Amino acid sequence: MSYLIKNSKITHFLTYRFLFCLFLISLTSCKTDKKLLTAQQIIDNSIKVSGVDKVHNSTLSFNFRDKKYIAERNSGVFVLKRISAMKDLQIEDQLSNQGFQRLINSRASMVADSMAVKYIESINSVHYFSVLPYGLNDNAVQKKLLKSTIIKGKKYYKVQITFNEDGGGVDFDDVFIYWIGAEDFKIDYLAYTFHVNGGGMRFREVRKEHLIEGTRLLDYNNFKPKDTNTKLSDLDKAFENNKLIKASEINLENIKITFN
């Protein structure tokens, strides 16, 4: 009788050990899977979670500072507009697959090439940031996964974005870094270099999210480094250590979106 009881205890013990080992293997496997995500997979997940994949066929309008912006997208065909009013004049700048044009009171107006380049940069920049991470799967985009980091106690994937010269636009040599939540795949921070107006770096912190028709659009606090020698990849550390200066706020207002 005691022999049977002893064997029963051994059997239960071995069964427990076996199940516990299976649990550890499963847990380790899950953690390993997360570590093995590629930059492409992380961006894909972020686009899906943010709902901006639907922007591909939509009309989006919003106000930014003193201008109105409208983006019409239809399966790769796009028209990006910036509209401003001055007294009796309405100026509408358009950037599309066909190029750039300016309309003044609905009539085409000539623009010097040197000025057109500046207008294109400005229009493209506002529309680009307004729907992030949409656009991060464009053909010209190159993705690189950097070392994960923690900001304010939250773990982030760190993805660097660069662009091919062919298809990367006039600012193809800009570099971006996105901090994407390791659990929720939301962009909470981003940083970038720029070369216009003397160049520099900026670090953006999401200050508010707008959920419009299932699409996550963002407002930001915009920072610049106190030390101009700070590396772009170290701006997250500079942010945590209060070594950034708030330069501005990026707020989208009167947001409307309809899907085709």
What is each model feature region?
Residues K81-V117:
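Mid-chain, structured segments of secreted extracytoplasmic proteins
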Residues Y157-I257:
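Gly/Pro-enriched, hydrophobic low-complexity segments
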Residues K34-Q41, R102-F172, N197:
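Flexible, processing/modification-adjacent segments and terminal tails
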